[in-house]
UniProtKB/Swiss-Prot annotation:
Pathway: Cell wall biogenesis; peptidoglycan recycling. The gene is nagZ. Its EC number is 3.2.1.52. One of its GO terms (biological process) is cell wall organization. Keywords: Cell cycle, Cell division, Cell shape, Cell wall biogenesis/degradation, Cytoplasm, Glycosidase, Hydrolase, Peptidoglycan synthesis. Substrate binds at residues 62, 70, 133, 163-164. InterPro entries: Beta_hexosaminidase_bac (IPR022956), Glyco_hydro_3_AS (IPR019800), Glyco_hydro_3_N (IPR001764), Glyco_hydro_3_N_sf (IPR036962), Glycoside_hydrolase_SF (IPR017853), NagZ_Beta-hexosaminidase (IPR050226). It comes from Cronobacter sakazakii (strain ATCC BAA-894). This is Beta-hexosaminidase. It catalyses: Hydrolysis of terminal non-reducing N-acetyl-D-hexosamine residues in N-acetyl-beta-D-hexosaminides.
């Protein structure tokens, strides 16, 4: 299994993409909205990807809910994480969050997609990049809601990825556009932002972690996604995490501080990442594949989905019909709530 996760351009593979997917360093593929037209087309694209790849790839998507849901038409419209507690309270919201985790995972597994990069464990709604993607402004409540969501995901056969370690919730800048800096004392980050990660790791509920492209300037001059301190010292040694560490997308401006594409990829692997994401830049991806030394990402093979349900079976089930309706209603309530603020 190779350590590089790539993307593809459209609704079906072109000849160059088939060739790239056969490269031994490619171990994963992430899908975006541009890859989706309808469920049948998506299923065929996944089949093409599987048949073209040398390795048994981990196929991923960001299907969190709210504003980050890559596949919408033909799938349940998932509400933003914040809406569960904000509109339903912790108890009823937690119950529906667990059902949301189950339904999201089932809908993706029916497409033969292994993981959705979820849930978001960032605390609070200040950050432009996070906002409603966070379950709550209190770390204990983020933890409680995330536990329910992950329980649902895992019951469907999907592994959970917590993001963005050690916490992106307190910085207003968007790491897709620049390198955010969080100047808060290390003790505050550890006590506040890291709590959901720390506790979920102790419960053995996180299968993977995605670090933040944020510089925590009181701690380390490198963004967490390229920092041996955060990934090896804190995440691996202090917290005892033995799951998969993903880099966030090395094409984001927040990663530019790490150098060229090949340098960014090597830096992320050297820092402790198991798998690096290189998206939205074909030349950058090819550069990484051409320049990385051969390496195996053995932990990543743990992330294959374990589900066997078909789309037809899922949508015929009473549970899916009930939960899909409840989630759609909450999504619509949340849109109305936001419009009235």
């Amino acid at each position: 299994m190779g350590p590089v996760m790539l993307d593809v351009e459209g609704f079906e593979l072109d000849a160059e993409e088939r060739e790239i997917l056969a490269h031994p360093l490619v171990g994963g593929l992430i899908l975006f909205t541009r890859n989706y037209h309808d469920p049948e087309q998506l299923r065929e694209l996944v089949r093409q990807i599987r048949s073209s790849a040398r390795n048994h790839l981990v196929i991923a998507v960001d299907q969190e809910g709210g504003r980050v849901q890559r596949f919408r038409e033909g799938f349940t419209r998932l509400p933003a994480a914040q809406s569960f507690a904000a509109l339903l309270g912790m108890d009823a919201g937690g119950k529906l969050a667990e059902e949301a985790g189950w339904l999201m995972a089932c809908e993706m597994i029916a497409m033969d997609i292994d993981i959705s990069f979820a849930p978001v464990l960032d605390v609070g709604h200040l950050s432009a990049a996070i906002g409603e993607r966070s379950f709550h402004e209190e770390p204990e409540n983020v933890l409680a809601m995330a536990k329910r969501f992950i329980t649902g995901m895992q019951s469907a056969g999907m592994k959970a990825t917590g993001k963005h370690f050690p916490g992106h919730g307190a910085v207003s800048a968007d790491s897709h556009k620049e390198t955010p800096r969080d100047p808060r004392p290390a003790a505050e980050i550890r006590r506040h932002d890291m709590l959901p990660f720390r506790e979920l790791i102790s419960y053995n509920m996180l299968d993977a972690v995605m670090p933040a492209h944020v510089v925590y300037s009181d701690v380390d001059p490198l963004p967490a996604s390229g920092s041996p301190y955060w990934l090896k010292q804190v995440l691996r040694k202090e917290l005892g995490f033995d799951g998969v560490i993903f880099s966030d997308d090395l094409s984001m401006e927040g990663a530019a501080i790490l150098g060229s594409y090949a340098e960014r990829g090597q830096a992320a692997l050297d820092a402790g990442c198991d798998m690096i994401l290189v998206c939205n830049n074909r030349k950058g991806a090819v550069s990484v594949l051409d320049n990385l030394s051969p390496i195996k990402a053995e932990r990543v093979t743990r992330l294959y989905h374990k589900g066997v349900i078909t789309r037809q079976e899922l949508m015929a089930s009473a549970r899916w019909k009930q939960v899909s309706g409840e989630l759609t209603a909450l999504h619509e309530r949340w849109q109305t709530h936001k419009a009235g603020q």
